[in-house]
């Protein structure tokens, strides 16, 4: 077993060797290096053929038409293109947008930008289980609502929203529905023929593909129109200009193909690993699971260890690569905005650690990690006066601390 152990698969995943092999065939002079937009020679034709094959592979995983897949630089760009693209195209129909307080920053900051441009945004508060229900969305709808954007699987707590039910609601009201699917590909079945979803963002690097490439599903029936945010040579039917990165795209296609093949077996294996880990730490007192116990992916276990400061715990777990919050905001010492929105107090939000498991996690690593967590929590609590007070039966929430 090699140290440190990687348990941060929701931040990024390593590229699968099968994917790396396919990518390497698209780089060198002997390989498939042409520009897919070059129409006049075989180098361009071959590159275009590979790009279209990858488009089919991505579409196959989510049961979409390949013509509905638009290549982008990642899920952040897909979120921006979907939300700004819809807002700017349909602004004459209405200026109201709906999202939730626990979306990824790529959605929240895009919404904030649109607010500066004069749009109105309603931010739905999730339940304590971290879920956004159709009833919550319905309560936020107005006559001038043009778009609802709700994530499929939450990146911090791993909860799965019922996007089928939310889609039924939005479609019946004539409101467009965007879903951030960055964390759900390869973990949850997605059938875009059945789901009433108009736009969906995808990322390769959360699904054992390369970084720097993603896609946006843009429904053809019913047709969704977007205003482009990137202008140039009119690539991707005018929605996203820029020379297509053949090697990245081939990598994403292969990664989604592998995900489709392996998903059923892999989910069972990861559920077993997640259960194995939790069984070994659940004896710790004052341990809380963040997010719904039932509607969640097994890949994510977000735990709060009360009376232990999360950053101290991460330092103590030097052989484990884990995080407190999402990778995009983990440099900030503010408590997780996602956990705060769930109603967790500052102390519990600060004492949370996200363990995320994946394709290359082993039982041996799980056992080692669980043992280290138990040791570190016990040791840090032994140093904590608050833990002593709790053990003595003092209700710490009732204490009035004097200001210095």
From Swiss-Prot:
It comes from the Bacteria. One of its GO terms (molecular function) is 2 iron, 2 sulfur cluster binding. The active site is at residue 328. It catalyses: (sulfur carrier)-H + L-cysteine = (sulfur carrier)-SH + L-alanine. It is found in: Cytoplasm. One of its GO terms (cellular component) is L-cysteine desulfurase complex. One of its GO terms (biological process) is [2Fe-2S] cluster assembly. Its main location: cytoplasm. Pathway: Cofactor biosynthesis; iron-sulfur cluster biosynthesis. Its cofactor is pyridoxal 5'-phosphate. It holds the Pfam family Aminotran_5. Its EC number is 2.8.1.7. [2Fe-2S] cluster binds at residue 328. The modification N6-(pyridoxal phosphate)lysine is found at residue 206. InterPro entries: Aminotrans_V_dom, Aminotrans_V_PyrdxlP_BS, Cys_deSase_IscS, Cysteine_dSase, PyrdxlP-dep_Trfase, PyrdxlP-dep_Trfase_major, PyrdxlP-dep_Trfase_small. Pyridoxal 5'-phosphate binds at residues 75-76, 155, 183, 203-205, 243. Keywords: 2Fe-2S, Cytoplasm, Iron, Iron-sulfur, Metal-binding, Pyridoxal phosphate, Transferase. PANTHER family: CYSTEINE DESULFURASE, CYSTEINE DESULFURYLASE FAMILY MEMBER. Master enzyme that delivers sulfur to a number of partners involved in Fe-S cluster assembly, tRNA modification or cofactor biosynthesis. Catalyzes the removal of elemental sulfur atoms from cysteine to produce alanine. Functions as a sulfur delivery protein for Fe-S cluster synthesis onto IscU, an Fe-S scaffold assembly protein, as well as other S acceptor proteins. Homodimer. Forms a heterotetramer with IscU, interacts with other sulfur acceptors. Belongs to the class-V pyridoxal-phosphate-dependent aminotransferase family. NifS/IscS subfamily. This is Cysteine desulfurase IscS. It comes from Pseudomonas fluorescens (strain ATCC BAA-477 / NRRL B-23932 / Pf-5).
């Amino acid at each position: 077993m090699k140290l440190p152990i990687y348990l941060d698969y929701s931040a990024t995943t390593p590229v699968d060797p099968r994917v790396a092999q396919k990518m390497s065939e698209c780089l060198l002079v002997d390989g498939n290096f042409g520009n897919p937009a070059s129409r006049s020679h075989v180098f361009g034709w071959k590159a275009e053929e590979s790009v279209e094959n990858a488009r089919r592979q991505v579409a196959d995983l989510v049961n979409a038409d390949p013509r509905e897949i638009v290549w982008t630089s990642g899920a952040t760009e897909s979120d921006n293109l979907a939300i700004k693209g819809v807002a700017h195209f349909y602004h004459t129909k209405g200026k109201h947008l709906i999202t939730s307080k626990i979306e990824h920053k790529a959605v929240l900051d895009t919404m904030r930008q649109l607010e500066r441009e004069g749009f109105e945004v309603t931010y739905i508060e999730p339940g304590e289980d971290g879920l956004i229900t159709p009833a919550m969305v319905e309560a936020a709808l107005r006559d001038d609502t043009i778009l609802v954007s709700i994530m499929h699987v939450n990146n911090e707590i791993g909860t799965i929203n019922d996007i089928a039910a939310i889609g039924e609601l939005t479609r019946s009201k004539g409101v467009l529905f965007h879903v951030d699917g960055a964390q759900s590909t390869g973990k949850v079945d997605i059938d875009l023929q059945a789901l009433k979803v108009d736009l969906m963002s995808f990322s390769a690097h959360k699904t054992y593909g390369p970084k720097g490439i993603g896609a946006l599903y843009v429904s053809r029936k019913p047709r969704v129109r977007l205003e482009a945010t990137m202008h140039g040579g009119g690539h991707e039917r005018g929605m996203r200009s820029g020379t297509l990165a053949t090697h990245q795209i081939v990598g994403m296609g292969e990664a989604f193909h592998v995900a489709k093949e392996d998903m059923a077996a892999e989910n069972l294996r990861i559920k077993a690993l997640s259960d194995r880990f939790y069984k070994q730490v659940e004896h710790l007192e004052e341990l809380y699971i963040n997010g719904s116990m039932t509607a969640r992916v097994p890949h994510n276990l977000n735990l709060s260890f009360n009376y232990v400061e999360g950053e101290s715990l991460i330092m103590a777990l030097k052989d484990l690569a884990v995080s407190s919050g999402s990778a995009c905001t983990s440099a900030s010492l503010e408590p997780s905005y996602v956990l705060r929105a769930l109603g967790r107090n500052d102390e519990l939000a600060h004492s949370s650690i996200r363990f995320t498991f994946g394709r290359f996690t082993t039982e041996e690593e799980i056992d080692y990690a669980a043992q280290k967590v138990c040791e570190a929590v016990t040791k840090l609590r032994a140093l904590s006066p608050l833990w002593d007070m709790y053990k003595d039966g003092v209700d710490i929430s009732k204490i009035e601390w004097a200001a210095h």
